[in-house]
Amino acid sequence: MPTINQLIRIGRENKRDKSTAPALKCCPQKRGVCTRVYTTTPKKPNSALRKVARVRLTNGIEVTSYIPGVGHNLQEHSVVLIRGGRVKDLPGVRYHIVRGTLDSVGVKDRKKSRSKYGAKRPK
């Protein structure tokens, strides 16, 4: 516990906020190349095959990112855009791939929440 005089002389140091998506380096999104596309299983109470990809970003960092939506066309060497946002039941997955940009096509036959999955307006 500091004394009043110590606080007057030095003052308190502000706590720094830790980034939840450090690989983006303060950018809203980053481009990268898929190095591996695979499925993985979620943590304990859940059961599924979640689609994920290892992505090497333009700044050289390699991250694991989630492929949202039903079905995808991604394979090795696909160029993708990633954004922050973790997947709660997949440990180590802190990024999402943005659907409908670069090599990633939008979700087919999507009627609701289309903007999140890069789907065009149905005719």
Curated annotation (Swiss-Prot):
MF terms (GO), sorted A to Z: rRNA binding; structural constituent of ribosome; tRNA binding
GO CC term, one of those recorded: small ribosomal subunit
Modified residues annotated as 3-methylthioaspartic acid in this record: D89
GO biological process, one term: translation
Assembly and oligomerization: Part of the 30S ribosomal subunit. Contacts proteins S8 and S17. May interact with IF1 in the 30S initiation complex.
Similarity-based family: Belongs to the universal ribosomal protein uS12 family.
The name this protein goes by in its record: Small ribosomal subunit protein uS12
Lineage, uppermost ranks: Bacteria, Pseudomonadati, Thermodesulfobacteriota, Desulfuromonadia, Desulfuromonadales
